[in-house]
């Protein structure tokens, strides 16, 4: 940040990298190498982790070079949970492990948003992978018609953290219209409140791709709430929201 130049007082106490709270997780849905380089040059100070969305890594040209760029910027990368599910449904878990080793990935997502997976089996994958990786486990369905009651969200998050997950992710997709949100994009505020009563907030990354959703979380839970599925071009705007330097959050931290 440039605050030595600006000398602006009374900014919120923003956590510093490497962060455990106030994480910004970016969703890379197919940036080119040049776009990745430009993105990191402009925004790397405010990015904590990058997800290569769904199965985009499979069709990404120069994938290993892209991963190298992120490594050189000290930003962990993980493959989208849909890719994990694609391996599981084909009974190729060992092949997935080999992929992680070959690509020197340090973080991994375990999800069941597209796949019917018994929760005990999901927790077993988390337990196994957590021996070697930081596991992010995603809770919630990608199906807008499937409503999961709050107690079930909480039970799943608790069990997945107990199994070894580093963070649990509140599902919203890249659209922000399922899971913790209604199809209009409105936050299911009662669900979020129930979750936070039982799950430490620093253990949850809330997928919040829309600005209104980011503002809602920041207004209630402060500048250091973990937010995910942020578009690369929205990283700097989100950081201004976290600091109260945008109209939507101007008076949050005064």
Q: Which residue ranges define each predicted feature?
A:
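C-terminal alpha-helical cap/extension of soluble enzyme domains
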Residues: 4-12, 194-254
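Glycine-rich phosphate-binding active-site loops on the catalytic face of alpha/beta enzymes
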Residues: 109-114, 162-177, 224-241, 245-248
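Catalytic cores of alpha/beta
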Residues: 92-98, 148-162, 209-223
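Hydrophobic faces of well-ordered beta-strands that scaffold small-molecule active sites
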Residues: 21-27, 48-52, 77-81, 108-110, ...
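Active-site-adjacent beta->alpha loops and helix N-cap segments on the catalytic face
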Residues: 34, 57-70, 86-95, 113-133, ...
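Active-site mouth loops of central-metabolism enzymes
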Residues: 20-34, 53-56, 78-92, 138-152
């Amino acid at each position: 940040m440039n605050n030595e130049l600006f000398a602006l007082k009374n900014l919120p106490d923003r956590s510093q990298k490497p962060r455990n709270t106030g994480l910004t997780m970016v969703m890379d849905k197919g940036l080119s190498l040049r776009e990745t380089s430009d993105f990191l040059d402009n925004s790397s100070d405010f990015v904590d982790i990058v997800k290569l969305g769904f199965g985009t890594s499979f069709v990404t040209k120069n994938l290993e070079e892209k991963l190298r760029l992120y490594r050189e910027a000290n930003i962990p990368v993980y493959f989208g949970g849909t890719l994990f599910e694609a391996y599981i449904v084909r009974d190729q878990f060992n092949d997935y492990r080999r992929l992680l080793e070959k690509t020197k990935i340090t973080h991994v997502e375990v999800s069941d948003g597209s796949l019917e997976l018994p929760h005990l089996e999901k927790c077993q994958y988390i337990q196994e992978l957590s021996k070697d990786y930081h596991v992010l486990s995603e809770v919630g369905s990608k199906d807008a018609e499937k409503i999961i009651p709050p107690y079930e969200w909480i039970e799943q998050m608790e069990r997945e953290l107990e199994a070894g997950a580093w963070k649990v992710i509140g599902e919203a997709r890249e659209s922000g219209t399922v899971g913790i949100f209604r199809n209009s994009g409105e936050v299911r505020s009662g669900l979020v409140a129930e979750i936070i009563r039982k799950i430490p907030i620093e253990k949850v990354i809330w997928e919040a791709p829309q600005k209104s959703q980011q503002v809602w979380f920041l207004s209630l839970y402060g500048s250091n709430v973990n937010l995910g599925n942020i578009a690369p071009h929205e990283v700097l705007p989100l950081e201004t929201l976290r600091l109260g330097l945008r109209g939507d959050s101007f008076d949050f931290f005064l």
